Amino acid sequence: MEPPDQCSQYMTSLLSPAVDDEKELQDMNAMVLSLTEEVKEEEEDAQPEPEQGTAAGEKLKSAGAQGGEEKDGGGEEKDGGGAGVPGHLWEGNLEGTSGSDGNVEDSDQSEKEPGQQYSRPQGAVGGLEPGNAQQPNVHAFTPLQLQELECIFQREQFPSEFLRRRLARSMNVTELAVQIWFENRRAKWRRHQRALMARNMLPFMAVGQPVMVTAAEAITAPLFISGMRDDYFWDHSHSSSLCFPMPPFPPPSLPLPLMLLPPMPPAGQAEFGPFPFVIVPSFTFPNV
């Protein structure tokens, strides 16, 4: 048999690899813990408010660290447990980042929604037809205010800015309303004046038509004028209105008798030329 010293040395040589493996695993666990702490500090610096994903990752890291510290399994099992901690860590980080990305997308959608809400009214306003556009409101004056404005218009059709402002202040209306009323009143007055001028021009246009007058009517017209009574002119001048002129004289009803000339004598018997007699017109004057 071998001596006891050799047996003890052999046993220590057999057990030394296991002890070395345990030390290596402890060192590896310590390194993993230090790495997890550094990653945790970086995440806290990058995200001051930890989210649910990071909290779940921390729980998984602590559970993996506790499982690595236990010495129930062999070296390979411990290696697998130690290597699983970073895997859970990255899964937790991915979940946290996905959650944060989801929150960012939600915030972007919430930011876009007001823009869409504002853009819809703009489109609705742009789609309005010209016929549906609201007309500007016109102020309705009271009868007393209209009477006052009419009196001012009779005195001055173009009021100054100071007068318009004073009227607006006294009537408790805007200056624009007063200005619009005066513009409309001037337009109405111009239309009335044009209508009066057109009505007065109609008789002149009727009298101005050309009339054919014969020589007999031209000769007899002064006789009819002298034979008319003064009552005719008086009645017609007063019966007609001031806007219309005096009507024209009526044409003669019956023509005067033509002058009867005797037959011409022969040329040899004429003593005083071709007309040896005196022509005396015979006119009958009407009884006055």
Swiss-Prot record:
Family classification: Belongs to the paired-like homeobox family. PEPP subfamily.
Query: What is the protein named?
Result: Rhox homeobox family member 2B
- Compositional bias ranges of the Basic and acidic residues kind: 68-80
The domain of life for this entry's organism is Eukaryota
Motif Nuclear localization signal located where? 186-195
For this protein, the DNA-binding region equals 134-193
Gene Ontology cellular component terms for the protein in this record: chromatin; nucleus
Q: Name one GO molecular function term.
A: DNA-binding transcription factor activity, RNA polymerase II-specific
What is known to happen upon mutating residue 227 to R? Found in infertile men; uncertain significance; decreased induction of target genes expression
What is the role of the protein in this entry? Answer: Transcription factor maybe involved in reproductive processes. Modulates expression of target genes encoding proteins involved in processes relevant to spermatogenesis.
Q: Describe, from its UniProt entry, the tissues in which this protein is expressed.
A: Expressed in testis, mainly expressed in germ cells, but also detected in somatic cells such as Sertoli cells, Leydig cells and peritubular cells.
The gene that this protein is the product of is RHOXF2B
Organism, scientific name: Homo sapiens (Human)
**Matches recorded under Pfam families:** Homeodomain
**Key words of the record:** DNA-binding, Homeobox, Nucleus
- Major place of residence: nucleus
